[in-house]
C-alpha cells in the first residue's frame, strides 16, 4: 500500500512539472522587472482597427512569441497590434514599433 502511494505521488509531481513547462500552470512574474518568468510566451495586445474592442485586455501569445509589436500606417495611426517571434518587417508606407515587455504595445 505504501509503495502504491509513493508511486502515485511521483506521478503527480511529474505531471505537475510537465504542466508548468507547457505553460499550463500558474504564470510567475518577476515583480522587479515586470516580466513573465518561466514559460516561453509573451503577453501582448492583439487586435486591428476593426476589432479594436479586443484591445481592452492583453492576450497570451503562442509559445516563443515574446515580441509585441504595433504596425502603423503612413498617417501615423496604428492598424495592427500583435505578437511575433521576431520583430516583423514593415511594408511600404508602414512603420513597426516593437517592444519586449508584457503588455508594452498598449499605445
Curated annotation (Swiss-Prot):
Q: Where in the cell is it found?
A: Secreted
Q: Which residues form the propeptide?
A: 20-34
Query: What is the documented function of this protein?
Result: Mammal-specific neurotoxin (tested on mice). Not toxic to lizards (tested on geckos).
Listed A to Z, the keywords are: Disulfide bond, Neurotoxin, Secreted, Signal, Toxin
Q: Which Gene3D superfamilies match?
A: CD59
The keyword Signal appears for this protein: yes
What family does this belong to?
Belongs to the three-finger toxin family. Ancestral subfamily. Boigatoxin sub-subfamily.
**Protein name, entry field:** Sulmotoxin 1
User: By its UniProt entry, which SUPFAM superfamilies does this protein fall under?
Assistant: Snake toxin-like
Q: What GO CC annotations are associated with the protein? A: extracellular region
Please give the chief subcellular localization of this protein. Answer: secreted
Q: Summarize the subunit comment.
A: Monomer.
> Secretion signal: which residues?
1-19
Query: Which cysteine-cysteine pairs are annotated as disulfide bonds in the entry?
Result: 44-68, 47-55, 61-83, 87-98, 99-104
Q: In which tissues is it expressed?
A: Expressed by the venom gland.
* Any one GO molecular function term: toxin activity
Pfam families xrefs: Toxin_cobra-type
Amino acid at each position: 500500500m505504501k509503495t502504491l502511494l509513493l508511486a502515485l505521488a511521483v506521478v503527480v509531481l511529474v505531471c505537475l512539472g510537465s504542466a508548468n513547462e507547457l505553460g499550463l500552470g500558474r504564470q510567475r512574474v518577476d515583480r522587479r522587472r515586470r516580466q513573465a518568468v518561466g514559460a516561453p510566451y509573451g503577453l501582448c495586445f492583439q487586435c486591428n482597427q476593426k476589432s479594436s474592442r479586443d484591445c481592452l485586455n492583453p492576450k497570451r501569445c503562442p509559445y516563443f512569441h515574446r515580441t509585441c509589436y504595433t504596425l502603423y500606417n503612413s498617417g501615423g495611426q496604428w492598424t495592427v497590434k500583435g505578437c511575433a517571434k521576431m520583430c516583423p518587417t514593415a511594408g511600404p508606407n508602414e512603420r513597426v514599433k516593437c517592444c519586449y515587455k508584457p503588455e508594452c504595445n498598449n499605445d
